[in-house]
Regions:
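Conserved small/polar residues in nucleotide/adenosyl-binding loops
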Residues: 1-5, 307-315
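Acidic-glycine-rich active-site phosphate/pyrophosphate-binding loop
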Residues: 11, 98-103, 190-197
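A glycine/threonine-rich phosphate-anchoring loop and its flanking beta-alpha core
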Residues: 42-139, 236-240
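Mobile late-domain/C-terminal helix-loop "cap" segments
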Residues: 220-305, 309
Length: 316
């Protein structure tokens, strides 16, 4: 969401009309815009200051949500992401003050969504889980199982929704899974990564590509690049989530098959898994790498450095 076009305008309207509560009706972009307006309402400076970690909010307007697009999980999270058109900067911020007061979630509101939009949302919520799942924190079996159960539920119900867009039960499962995926519950007690999201933010800041479509490209590439640093976890993902059954001695093959099945799942939903599939060439790779490298929010899976050399490799 472009901060220049919507957030400043919303802040001005709220101040002029003495608004006391913001109701966001929509998906992640709508909710995040509402949160940004709530964040800037009582702040005398530029609301972008928060996204550059220059200040902390003292007060925010309360926000409520009527969810129409399950994807971002913003209806239950303290986080938001917006884009500043000047410099094409896409940045996130989080504060408990921004967690919505309530969220009304009726699966029937999602029946009319184009399936591609539904698929992008599914990719986003899977990525939210995987950013937390791929960790080196030990003894997190409970949250591992929560992550795995959510991913399996999303994958199986995505197939049902593809067959029947008005399958209420499948829509409900996906909507609930998207909320849990980014509520903070499954990340408790474990180091999270968020490298793939940071890379994708630079991609969708420059190009007109849906966030979920960018993630379906970036995440498998990232997995192929970093798996050596924690092979056991990638084997676990392949076996428990993607149902790969190969001999225990075939570690590399198991990992690659797990990633391949994830890519095939994305493809089955009509999502891209290569930059070339969405017409993106290499002209901005170095620029995106430099911006992503300066984000400062990478919690690494491993000892792999997200350098200017590493990032273009993942992006390609």
């Amino acid at each position: 969401m472009c901060i220049r076009d919507r957030v400043y305008e919303g802040i001005d309207i709220c101040r002029q009309q003495n608004i006391e509560f913001i109701l966001a009706v929509g998906g992640g972009s709508v909710i995040d815009t509402a949160k940004a307006v709530a964040l800037g309402f009582s702040y005398e400076g530029d609301v972008w200051d928060f996204f550059e970690n220059r200040n902390e909010p003292e007060a925010c307007l309360p926000v409520g949500v009527v969810l129409t697009i399950p994807a971002a999980g913003s209806e239950s999270s303290e986080n938001l992401v917006i884009t500043k058109e000047d410099g094409l900067l896409k940045r996130g911020y989080g504060s408990e003050k921004l967690r919505p007061q309530f969220a009304i979630m009726n699966p029937e509101t999602t029946y009319s969504l184009p399936f591609y939009q539904t698929a992008c949302g599914i990719s986003d919520m899977l990525a939210h889980i995987m950013e937390r799942y791929f960790t080196k924190t030990e003894h997190v079996d409970v949250s591992d199982r929560l992550c795995e159960g959510l991913m399996r539920a999303i994958i199986s119900n995505a197939k049902l929704v593809k067959q029947d867009p008005e399958n209420y039960d499948a829509r409900a499962e996906i909507m609930w899974a998207g909320t849990l995926a980014h509520s903070g519950l499954i990340g408790m007690g474990r180091e999270e990564d968020w490298g793939s999201h940071a890379i994708e933010h630079e991609l969708s800041a420059i190009y007109d590509i849906a966030h979920g479509a960018g993630l379906s490209i970036i995440f498998p590439a990232w997995m192929k690049h970093v798996y050596r640093e924690n092979e056991e976890r990638f084997v676990q993902f392949a076996q428990r989530v993607m149902n790969v059954e190969l001999p225990n001695s075939m570690v590399y093959e198991t990992i690659m098959e797990g990633i391949s099945r994830l890519e095939c799942f994305y493809t089955s939903l009509g999502l891209p898994t290569r930059l070339s599939a969405v017409g993106i060439d290499s002209s901005h790779l170095e620029e995106m790498a430099k911006k992503a490298n300066s984000c400062g929010n990478f919690k690494k899976l491993d000892a792999v450095s997200y350098t200017h050399l590493t990032l273009p490799t993942i992006l390609r």
